[in-house]
C-alpha cells in the first residue's frame, strides 16, 4: 500500500542522503560510459590500454546522466514512501543509463546470471552492450523494467498514460526528450491528461528533459523563453515545476524537493477525486529538467565544447583506440567518478549503494507492471454465438457486418469492466460498434455542455477511448497491453497507415520478447479492426481508399503476425473471439461496416474460421470431379463479386465445373515452412489443384497474394484481381469494375482462362462487356447501382 506523503520529512535531503544519492548517480554514470567503451578492465584495476577498448564504439552518452539523475531520485521516493512506480524513458538511446541502474539494483544479475555483481559479471555487462551476440543500444525488451524501447521517438508519453489507465496505485514517471518533444505524436499526447481519471486510474509524472540538443541541432523547447515554455504546459493543463542547472551539489536538493512536491500533489488530486470531494479535471504536475547534454563528461575535446553540446550525443571520443591522448582522457573521465569508492573488491556495488536501492518488486527494473504478462488475467468472454445473425441459407440475407461485433464487444465490456478498453479515432459509432454505449461511455474529462447529454455518451468513467490521433490511441493501447490488460482498436482502413511505424515497432518488441527474452510473460495481443474499407469508400473517394496496411504487416515476423478477412458477420464474430483469447500477436481484422450478404451460420462460421481457408461446397459444382476452374476470394465485398461471377458462369455454362474457395486467414496461402499458419503444399494443391486456372479476387493489392503464394506449384495459373489505385466518388459496383474485381470482369477472366470456353464463350463474353458498359452508364445517370445489383442474392 502506497503511503501518504509527509512533505516535512521528505522534501529535504539530509547530508548522508545526498552523499548516497550522488554516489549512486556517479556509479550509474560510470557504468554508462563503461558500456559504451570497455570490453575489459571494468574497474580500472590497471591503467587503461587499447586492448581494453571495444573495436567498434556504439551507443549514446548524452542523455544518460540526466536519466540516471532522475532514476536515483525516484528510487529515494520509492523507498521512503513505498511507491508503486515505473519509469518510461523517451530517449531510448539512453539505454546505458537504464541498464546501469538495473545492474545496480541487482535485477539485471537475477535475469542474466552471466552479468553478476562481480568483476567478471561487470566485464560481461560492459562487453555485451551494442556488441554482436550481445544486446542492442536502446531500451529493448531485454531491458528489465522497460515497456518502451524508445528507438523511434514520439510515443513515450502515450505509453506512460496507457500504463496508468486502470492502475490506481501506479505512478508512471515519464522522461520526454526535448528532441522527441518535436514529434507530432508526442505533441498530441500531452492531451492524454484529459482522459486520465484520478478516481480510478494511476498518475503520470511527465519530466521534460531539456538537455538542449539533438544529434546535430538545438532543440526548439530549449530555445524559447521560460515564460513561453511555462505557458505552453499550463495551456496543456499541467502545473510545471522547473529544475535547472549544472551543479549536482545544488540540483540534488532541488530535485528531491520538487519530486516530493509533485508526488504530494498527485496524492492530493487522487484523494480528492476518490473521496468525491472534487470532480474537476486536475492540473497534474510535471517537471522541466534542464541539465547539460553529456553532463559530467569531458568539457572540451580538441578545443570544442562537448559537455552541454550536441557533440556529446553519441560517442564523444571515437578514436580512443588510436589516439593515446584521448585514451588518457577517457581514463580520466572514468576515474572522475571515483569507482574505487563505488565498488568493492569483488566488483559488487558497495553496501552504501545497495542500502538505498528499493527492495524486490518495488525496484523499477523489477516492477511486475513492466512484465505485464505476469499480471494478465484472461478475459471472461461471452459466447459470440449469442450475437450471431440468422442465416437461413447462404447468400440470401443481409446484415451490417460490424454491428453484431459491436454487440459482442458490449458484452465483453460488461463482463470485464476493469481490464478491457475499446480504442478508436472518433469512429466507434461510424464503424457501427456503438452498441457498446448501452453499457459504457467515452472517457472524457474535458468540459461538458448540456447538449452532450443528447447522444454524446461522455463520461469520466467510460471504457471507450476516442481522440482523433491514431498515434495516441495506439500508444495508449500498446502500453495497456504490455502492462497486463486487454484492448481492441477499430479504425478506418486507409488511415491505419498513420500508425504503420508504431505497429512495426510493436511487432519487433513482441518478436524479440518471444524469441529472445524467456522471462517476459505473454501479453494480450494487439487487435486491430480495419473497417470503412476501400470497397465502400464510395462517398469519401480516392483519399479514403487504401488497403495497404496489411502489406506492411506481412513484412513482419511470422511469429507475431496474423491477418484475417472474414467474409460475413458471423465469421467476424468468430475471428474476434479468437483474437481476444490470443497472446503475443498482432491480429489485423479487415471487415467492412456496411450491409452485406451473409453466408454462414454461427457454427459453420466457427468451423470455417478455425480452418482459415476452405471450399464452399454450396457455391461449388465440382463435387466428385476435377474442377475446370478455381474461383477464390478473400475479403467481404470481393467475395460477393466472386460469388456473383460464379453464379453467372453456372447460369451460362451449366457444365462448367467450378470450385469456390474462400480464405479468411491470409497466411494460409504461405507455405508452412514460412508461416505457422501456412498450408502444406499437399493441402494447398488439394484446394487449388496443380494445373487448373485460379481466379483469385482479393480485398487488397493483388501483388500481395503473389508474394505469399509465389512458391506454390500452380502459381503460374494464379490470376489475382484486387485494388489497383483506381477510384473516386463511385458506386460500389462501379468501383469494383474500375479495379476489375467485379462479377463481369471475373467471368470474362474465367472464359479467357478455361480452354474449352475460349471459343464457345465468345458470345457470353461480349454480353458481359455490354453489362460493364451499361452498369457504368447507369451509375453516371442515376448515381446508384441498379436494383438487381443492390438486391442480388445467391441464386442456387
Swiss-Prot record:
| GO MF terms, alphabetically ordered | aldehyde-lyase activity
Locate the coiled-coil region(s) and give their ranges.
Answer: none
Cofactor(s) recorded for this entry are: thiamine diphosphate
EC class (word): lyase
CDD domains referenced in this protein's UniProt entry, alphabetically: TPP_PK
| EC code | 4.1.2.-
Any single Pfam family the record assigns to this protein: XFP
Tagged with keyword rRNA processing = no
The record's annotation in Gene3D superfamilies points to: 3.40.50.920, 3.40.50.970
Database matches in NCBIfam families: PRK05261.1-2, PRK05261.1-4
Question: What is the protein name stated in its UniProt record?
Answer: Probable phosphoketolase
Source organism per entry reads Synechococcus elongatus (strain ATCC 33912 / PCC 7942 / FACHB-805)
* Lineage of the species this protein comes from: Bacteria, Bacillati, Cyanobacteriota, Cyanophyceae, Synechococcales
Amino acid at each position: 500500500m502506497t503511503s501518504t506523503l509527509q512533505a516535512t520529512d521528505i522534501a529535504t535531503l539530509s547530508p548522508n542522503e545526498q552523499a548516497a544519492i550522488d554516489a549512486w548517480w556517479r556509479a550509474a554514470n560510470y557504468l554508462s560510459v563503461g558500456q559504451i567503451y570497455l570490453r575489459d578492465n571494468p574497474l580500472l584495476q590497471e591503467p587503461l590500454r587499447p586492448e581494453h577498448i571495444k573495436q567498434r564504439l556504439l551507443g549514446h552518452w548524452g542523455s544518460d546522466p540526466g536519466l540516471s539523475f532522475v532514476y536515483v531520485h525516484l528510487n529515494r521516493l520509492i523507498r521512503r514512501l513505498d511507491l508503486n512506480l515505473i519509469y518510461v524513458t523517451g530517449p531510448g538511446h539512453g539505454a546505458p543509463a537504464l541498464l546501469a541502474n538495473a545492474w545496480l539494483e541487482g535485477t539485471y544479475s537475477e535475469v542474466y546470471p552471466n552479468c553478476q555483481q562481480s568483476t567478471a559479471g561487470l566485464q560481461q555487462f560492459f562487453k555485451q552492450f551494442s556488441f554482436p551476440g550481445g544486446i542492442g543500444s536502446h531500451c529493448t525488451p531485454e531491458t528489465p523494467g522497460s515497456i518502451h524501447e524508445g528507438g523511434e521517438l514520439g510515443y513515450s508519453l502515450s505509453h506512460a498514460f496507457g500504463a496508468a489507465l486502470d492502475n490506481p496505485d501506479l505512478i508512471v514517471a515519464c522522461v520526454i526528450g526535448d528532441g522527441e518533444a518535436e514529434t507530432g505524436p508526442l505533441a498530441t499526447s500531452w492531451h492524454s491528461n484529459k482522459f486520465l481519471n484520478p478516481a480510478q486510474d494511476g498518475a503520470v509524472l511527465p519530466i521534460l528533459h531539456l538537455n538542449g540538443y539533438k544529434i546535430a541541432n538545438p532543440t526548439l523547447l530549449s530555445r524559447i523563453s521560460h515564460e513561453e515554455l511555462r505557458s505552453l504546459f499550463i495551456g496543456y493543463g499541467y502545473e510545471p515545476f522547473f529544475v535547472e542547472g549544472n551543479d549536482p551539489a545544488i540540483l540534488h536538493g532541488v530535485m528531491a524537493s520538487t519530486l516530493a512536491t509533485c508526488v504530494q500533489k498527485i496524492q492530493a488530486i487522487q484523494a480528492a477525486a476518490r473521496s468525491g470531494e472534487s470532480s474537476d479535471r486536475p492540473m497534474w504536475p510535471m517537471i522541466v529538467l534542464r541539465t547539460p547534454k553529456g553532463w559530467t563528461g569531458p568539457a572540451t575535446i580538441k578545443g570544442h565544447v562537448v559537455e552541454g553540446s550536441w557533440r556529446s550525443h553519441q560517442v564523444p571520443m571515437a578514436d580512443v583506440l588510436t589516439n593515446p591522448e584521448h585514451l588518457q582522457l577517457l581514463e580520466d573521465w572514468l576515474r572522475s567518478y571515483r569507482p574505487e569508492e563505488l565498488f568493492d573488491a569483488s566488483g559488487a556495488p558497495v553496501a552504501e549503494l545497495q542500502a538505498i536501492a528499493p527492495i524486490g518488486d518495488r525496484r523499477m527494473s523489477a516492477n511486475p507492471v513492466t512484465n505485464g504478462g505476469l499480471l494478465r488475467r484472461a478475459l471472461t468472454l461471452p459466447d459470440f454465438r449469442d450475437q450471431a445473425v440468422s442465416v437461413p441459407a447462404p447468400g440470401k440475407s443481409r446484415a451490417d457486418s460490424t454491428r453484431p461485433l459491436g454487440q459482442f464487444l458490449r458484452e465483453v465490456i460488461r463482463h470485464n469492466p476493469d481490464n478491457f478498453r475499446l480504442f478508436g479515432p472518433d469512429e466507434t459509432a461510424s464503424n457501427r460498434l456503438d452498441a457498446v454505449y448501452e453499457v459504457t461511455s467515452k472517457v472524457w474529462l474535458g468540459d461538458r455542455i448540456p447538449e452532450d447529454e443528447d447522444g454524446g455518451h461522455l463520461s469520466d468513467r467510460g471504457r471507450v477511448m476516442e481522440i482523433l490521433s491514431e498515434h495516441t490511441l495506439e500508444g495508449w493501447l500498446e502500453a495497456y497491453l504490455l502492462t497486463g490488460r486487454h484492448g481492441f482498436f477499430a479504425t478506418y482502413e486507409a488511415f491505419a497507415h498513420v500508425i504503420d511505424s508504431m505497429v512495426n515497432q510493436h511487432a519487433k518488441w513482441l518478436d524479440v520478447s518471444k524469441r529472445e527474452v524467456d522471462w517476459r510473460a505473454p501479453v494480450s495481443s494487439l487487435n486491430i479492426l480495419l473497417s470503412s474499407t476501400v470497397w465502400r469508400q464510395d462517398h469519401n473517394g480516392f483519399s479514403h481508399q487504401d488497403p495497404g496496411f496489411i502489406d506492411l504487416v506481412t513484412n513482419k515476423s511470422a511469429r507475431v503476425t496474423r491477418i484475417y478477412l472474414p467474409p460475413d458477420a458471423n465469421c467476424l464474430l468468430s475471428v474476434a473471439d479468437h483474437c481476444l483469447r490470443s497472446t503475443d500477436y498482432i491480429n489485423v481484422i479487415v471487415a467492412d461496416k456496411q450491409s452485406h450478404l451473409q453466408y454462414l451460420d454461427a457454427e459453420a462460421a466457427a468451423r470455417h474460421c478455425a480452418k482459415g481457408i476452405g471450399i464452399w461446397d454450396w457455391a461449388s459444382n465440382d463435387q466428385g470431379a476435377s474442377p475446370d476452374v478455381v474461383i477464390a476470394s478473400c475479403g467481404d465485398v470481393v467475395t460477393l463479386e466472386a460469388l456473383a461471377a460464379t453464379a453467372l458462369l453456372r447460369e451460362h455454362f451449366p457444365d462448367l465445373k467450378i470450385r469456390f474457395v474462400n480464405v479468411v486467414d491470409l497466411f494460409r496461402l504461405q507455405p508452412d515452412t514460412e508461416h505457422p499458419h501456412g498450408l502444406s503444399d499437399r493441402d494447398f494443391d488439394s484446394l487449388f489443384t496443380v494445373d487448373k486456372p485460379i481466379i483469385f479476387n482479393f480485398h487488397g493489392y493483388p501483388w500481395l497474394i503473389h508474394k505469399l503464394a509465389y512458391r506454390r506449384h500452380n502459381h503460374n495459373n494464379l490470376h489475382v484481381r484486387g485494388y489497383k489505385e483506381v477510384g473516386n466518388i463511385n458506386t460500389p459496383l462501379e468501383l469494383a469494375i474500375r479495379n476489375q474485381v467485379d462479377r463481369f470482369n471475373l467471368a470474362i477472366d474465367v472464359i479467357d482462362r478455361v480452354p474449352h470456353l475460349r471459343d464457345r464463350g465468345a458470345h457470353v463474353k461480349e454480353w458481359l462487356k455490354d453489362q460493364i458498359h451499361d452498369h457504368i452508364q447507369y451509375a453516371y445517370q442515376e448515381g446508384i447501382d441498379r436494383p438487381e445489383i443492390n438486391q442480388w442474392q445467391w441464386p442456387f
